[in-house]
UniProtKB/Swiss-Prot annotation:
This is 4-hydroxy-2-oxovalerate aldolase. The keyword Membrane does not apply. GO terms for molecular function: 2-isopropylmalate synthase activity; 4-hydroxy-2-oxovalerate aldolase activity; manganese ion binding. Coiled coil: none annotated. Disulfide bonds: none annotated. Residues 4-255 form the Pyruvate carboxyltransferase domain. It catalyses: (S)-4-hydroxy-2-oxopentanoate = acetaldehyde + pyruvate. Substrate binds at R12, D13, S166, H194. Keywords: Aromatic hydrocarbons catabolism, Lyase, Manganese, Metal-binding. Its EC number is 4.1.3.39. The active site is at H16. It comes from Streptomyces griseus subsp. griseus (strain JCM 4626 / CBS 651.72 / NBRC 13350 / KCC S-0626 / ISP 5235). The keyword Nuclease does not apply.
Length: 340
């Protein structure tokens, strides 16, 4: 059987679903359960990564230092991972994370902007740390563009590269084409896939990624994450095993960890609700959902139309101001712009 490495961002990406408010006890208990299941990598942090706790995107319940040290102490078999976005995280944040014993660093950038990771990947390379680079909102770039960006990231020092289906927009053939192109471009460098479940395709897309050559696959307990959630880890693992890929994970212990996560980490497991389906079809960042619904409701505009217009404009995270413009235009209170 071919080996795949499972990367579990339950304690980082899942934070988006609870406004980044997971406490240290919750982090420790899930980390211990994932470790008992022999999950290879357990990622922890604010949902937006190192240095991101703020009024702008949400204050975490604990500091980065406290989260990393708590989970580090809980892990005996699993490796400790963390995440950062250039613009939030800094070299100082990376340096402190190294001091806490982080084993795997992920640097996330927009699908066409690998150059933004150059400084941080170089810093981690020079520090002797394992650094990965993930290209987010990857449906907004062609297979060839993603392959080119991934190759650049490897040149900057990434020891694994891959894509995040941040909007949950892909179907399996989309994943096959993109992962295949990246694998061809980077050779023996491991390729990563991180799915979202807006269209209910996260597990199928992850299997397609593995079959196309991805060797690092992400999944969260109960799919814990914003909107429709991420790839459901305890479903992903046995499906991969049935598909001929070895994970090295203890299934019963993994199911126990998922049960614990449902009881202690989340108010309810995520599902592909109507707005999540629409945002996935439109190819729009799931984090826009609450703001779209709020502004559209106040203006008497159908939020589904707002999502599809944002998709036509290729809105990305950080462009929340576009929501205001689109709602105003659809309600007849604003002029049409050239971007429409």
């Amino acid at each position: 059987m071919k080996q795949v490495v499972i990367h579990d961002p339950t304690l980082r990406d899942g934070q988006h679903a609870v406004h980044h408010r997971l406490g240290l006890t919750e982090l420790r208990r899930y980390a211990e359960a994932a470790d008992a299941a022999r999950v290879p990598v357990v990622e922890v942090g604010h949902g937006n990564g190192l240095g991101a706790s703020s009024l702008q995107v949400g204050l975490a319940a604990a500091t980065d230092d406290a989260m990393l040290s708590t989970v580090r102490e809980a892990l005996r078999h699993s490796r400790l991972g963390t995440f950062m976005l250039p613009g939030w995280g800094t070299s100082d944040d990376l340096r402190r994370a190294i001091s806490h014993g982080v084993d795997v660093f992920r640097v996330g950038v927009h699908a066409t902007e690998a150059s933004l990771a150059e400084h941080h990947l170089g810093f981690l390379r020079d520090a002797g740390a394992e650094a990965h680079c993930v290209l987010m909102m990857s449906h907004m770039a062609s297979p060839g563009e993603l392959a080119e960006q991934a190759a650049r990231a490897v040149g900057y020092g990434a020891q694994a590269v891959g894509i995040m289906d941040s909007a949950g927009h892909f179907l399996p053939p989309d994943v096959t084409a993109r992962i295949g192109a990246i694998v061809e471009a980077v050779g023996t460098v491991p390729v990563i896939f991180h799915g979202h479940n807006n269209l209910g395709m996260a597990v199928a897309n992850s299997v397609a990624a593995a079959e196309a050559g991805a060797r690092i696959i992400d999944g969260c307990a109960r799919g814990f994450g914003a909107g429709a959630g991420n790839t459901q880890l305890e479903v992903l693992v046995p499906v991969l095993e049935r598909s001929g890929f070895a994970t090295g994970i203890d299934l019963y212990a993994l199911l126990d960890a998922a049960d614990l996560a449902e009881r202690e980490l989340m108010p309810a497991p995520p599902v592909p609700a109507s707005m999540s389906i629409v945002s996935g079809l439109a190819g729009v960042f799931s984090g826009f959902k609450h703001r779209v619904v709020e502004l559209a409701g106040a203006a008497g505009v159908d939020p589904r139309e707002v999502f599809f217009e944002l998709g036509r404009r290729q809105a990305i995270a950080g462009q929340e101001d576009l929501i205001v413009d689109v709602v105003a235009e659809l309600s007849g209170r604003g002029p049409k712009t050239d971007a429409a």
